[in-house]
Amino acid sequence: MRLALLLLAILVATELVVSGKNPILQCMGNRGFCRSSCKKSEQAYFYCRTFQMCCLQSYVRISLTGVDDNTNWSYEKHWPRIP
């Protein structure tokens, strides 16, 4: 009986250790995932802190120039003017 309890305790303890996953690191403001290789539907843009690629979905657009697109949303329209 003791042997069965000991085996059960070892089995449960090893299952908890083996089943634990590493948390997936996110990058680009939670738009991408840090992986060693990107999936077919993803593109690598730069590297994460873990020296893995930051993989983004193909539909995610990033402005590399830092210039905002020409939209109606602007800083002047967002904040009220102070007289």
Swiss-Prot record:
Entry comment describing in which tissues the protein is expressed: Specifically expressed in male gonads (Sertoli cells).
InterPro entries assigned to the protein according to its UniProt record, in alphabetical order: Defensin_big_dom
Alphabetic keyword roster: Antibiotic, Antimicrobial, Defensin, Disulfide bond, Secreted, Signal
Major subcellular site: secreted
GO cellular component: extracellular region
Top-rank lineage group of the source organism: Eukaryota
Pfam families per UniProt: Defensin_big
Disulfide bonds: C27-C54, C34-C48, C38-C55
PANTHER family per record: BETA-DEFENSIN 119
Family: Belongs to the beta-defensin family.
Protein name as annotated: Beta-defensin 19
Gene designation per UniProt: Defb19
